[in-house]
Amino acid sequence: MESLILKKSLITFFIIFLFTSSTLFSGEIWIEPKDELFVKKLEFTSNSLDHPIDSTSYPISKAKLKTRTSDELLRNFYSRNNLKNKFSIKYANNLFPIRDILDSNRHEKSFSFEKTFEKNSTAGKLSVTKNISPIFDDEYLFSGTHLSMILGNSVLGIGFIERWWGPGNDNSLILSNYSDPQPGIYLESLSGFRFENFMSFIGKVNYSFFINHLDDDRVINNTNLIGARITIQPNTNLTLGFSRVTMFGGDNRPDSFESFIDNLFRLKRTENGLDLSNEIAGYDLKYNFRFNKVLISSYFQLIGEDELRFTPSTKIFTLGNEIIFLKNGLLRSVGIEYSNTISNFGDRYNTAYEHSSYKSGYRYKNLPLGAFIDGDSIFLKLTTNIELSEYFFINFSLFQGEFNKDNSGLTNVWGISNEEYAGSKIKIGYSFNKNFNLDLGILAVNKNLYFNSKEMDKITFNLGLNYNF
């Protein structure tokens, strides 16, 4: 039933889109994970003001980024992104398996078309991708397509929204953009709010809630993915995040409203001998502080199985540090991040992202919903971002790790044949003018990695050409 409702809603969206007046002007309500470098620059410029920016919960509404010093940055950003149509061609010699928050190319070969619009309190995007990669079955994808409506200080919408929950740049343990976004409905805070009573010490509060449908081929088909996140910012420097994501319902599973309430408030774990759901939850912290003209960030994220008392068990974690500064108004950053998805801080295998009933695990179309390294893995990465001009940037990183360290289990996307590895990655973005830009990525690894039972090349490159009009 949920699947039918979502599909009908999406069809309604397309009808509205096709017959909407042509007087709509270009616009986008969201800043997406791929715009992370722009958000870093905003973080730097806004830190000295009493207007904290929550950079741990993507997508980010434009209203959350408004500060006195950010206005010019926002104008420059949108002046380069104010064309309402986009045509892209992407090519890679192999699947690009080691990705981070900036990487949006999930397929070997594809071409896509986007159209964005905004009118009064409504904004949306129609994005259609033709996937011609032999490794995937989906011929057409709608990643990024959405219809959003502003209701007071909230955004209500439907679509395929890319999310990234957590302060990390390389891994988000609970929700990342590694897999394709799923169809669903959502409610997000527009600009956040503050309590005016005895709870004012909490500071600025933002929230995000969604119900998605996992429409892939699973052990339990028609599973729903339900997520909620709240962040609080007691001061300009500190951001605390609390997240929970649940797999609920599906074929031959408890899915009544009563079961939903029992699961939502953790009133009970089982019904008729069946686990009500598969939940993971946890918290994260990011602290920024200035030293001379440098912004220093320290962060961590801890996620585990959600228990009856709302306390995560069998924990996995990410921690990192980053330095951000500007040179002649251009971004420079250096960061180091470490992730460990072996449960109980490295002592328990075959637990993270797995479940006894939802046997397909915490994945969508055989790609992780959380950390790209999947379960039982470790990953360390050193990254630098250099903006050479407003139209030219370089992202370079060195990394090492080990996938599925105990080499067991049938559902881990990295299989059971990988060894310790090390490598480097470079990404270059260049805009020739307002209309035409390209992205070039090169990944070099010292071992032939296995991903979804396919052997990857040691050197992978991808090229993206984008025409905006």
PLM regions and their residue ranges:
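Short loop/turn motifs that connect adjacent beta-strands in outer-membrane beta-barrel proteins
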Residues: 52-53, 76-86, 116-125, 150-153, ...
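Outer-membrane beta-barrel translocator domains and adjoining extracellular loop/strand segments
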Residues: 98-101, 136-139, 168-174, 198-201, ...
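Transmembrane beta-strands of outer-membrane beta-barrel proteins
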Residues: 85-89, 122-128, 156, 200-209, ...
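Surface-exposed coil loops of outer-membrane beta-barrel proteins
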Residues: 96-98, 161-231, 241, 248-274, ...
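N-terminal periplasmic/intermembrane-space "pro-region" immediately following the signal or transit peptide
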Residues: 25-103
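Residues on the lipid-exposed face of transmembrane beta-strands in outer-membrane beta-barrel proteins
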Residues: 111-119, 145-151, 158, 185-191, ...
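Outer-membrane beta-barrel pore domains
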Residues: 273-469
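Transmembrane beta-strands of outer-membrane beta-barrel pores
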Residues: 93-97, 119-121, 128-134, 151-153, ...
